[in-house]
A protein has these predicted regions:
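Short, flexible helix/strand-to-coil boundary loops that buttress conserved ligand/catalytic motifs
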Residues: 21, 62, 123, 158-161, ...
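Conserved alpha/beta core of the MobA/IspD/sugar-nucleotide pyrophosphorylase nucleotidyltransferase superfamily
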Residues: 2, 163-208
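Nucleotide and nucleotide-moiety/phosphate-recognizing core
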Residues: 2-143, 177-188
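Conserved nucleotide-sugar donor-binding
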Residues: 144-157, 198
Length: 208
């Protein structure tokens, strides 16, 4: 099984949340660390954390993130690498591009926004086991995350001008032949959750 690198996108402003989403408290730990820890069940796992706005708050809250910028850091069995997007104003796609430039060109990746909970091992494995240019989980007839991208596809994202209207992952996926996309049905509505407000966060913490 080709083990993909996890890319956690945490470079946004978190305006509606009011504070960096990855630094929210989740049962005594920080949310970004919880997300990383959920990937430990995948053997030989590597996680890239894409930071942008508020990156200094992340580095202050998690001191070893500073070390993980230059060298990978083992956290709960996951090799973590931190990448800072110095131009986060261009959106999450620019953060994704910044991270992808650090990833081995032959590696498969799975992309997850910080405000979408990572799936459990069984659901995640069902995504990882599928082989195509793009693999997308679905639940209740809604597409979601994490999205798996093979190296052939994601390498085509690197040259895209961040000023372009096409500088969006969903736009690039829509341009693919339908045979290049596999949809995997997941019995977990986490795939389409977007926990971007305090109300949604409080509800998630109470129900999970």
């Amino acid at each position: 099984m080709d083990i993909p690198n996890l890319i956690l996108l945490a470079g946004g402003k978190s305006t509606r949340m009011g504070s960096p989403k990855g630094l929210l408290d989740y049962r005594g730990t920080l949310w970004v660390l919880e997300q990383i820890a959920r990937y430990k069940f995948i053997e030989n796992s590597i996680a890239y954390i894409g930071l942008g706005y508020d990156y200094e708050q992340y580095l202050n809250a998690i001191p070893w993130f500073k070390d993980a910028i230059e060298n990978s850091y083992n956290y709960n069995g996951v090799e973590v690498r931190v990448v800072i997007n110095n131009q986060p104003q261009f959106g999450s796609f620019s953060t994704l591009q910044t991270v992808l430039k650090k990833v081995d060109i032959d590696s498969t990746v799975i992309v997850l926004p910080i405000d979408v909970p990572l799936l459990n091992k069984q659901s995640l494995t069902s995504i990882i086991n599928e082989n195509n240019k793009v693999v997308i989980p679905t639940c209740d007839a809604k597409n979601g995350h994490p999205v798996k991208l093979n190296s052939e596809f994601w390498n085509t994202l690197l040259p895209i001008d961040m000023f372009s209207k096409n500088a969006r992952l969903d736009t690039q996926i829509k341009q693919l032949n339908s045979l290049s996309i596999t949809f995997v049905n997941i019995i977990d509505n986490s795939v389409y959750q977007n926990i971007n407000t305090k109300e949604k966060w409080n509800y998630y913490c109470k129900t999970q």
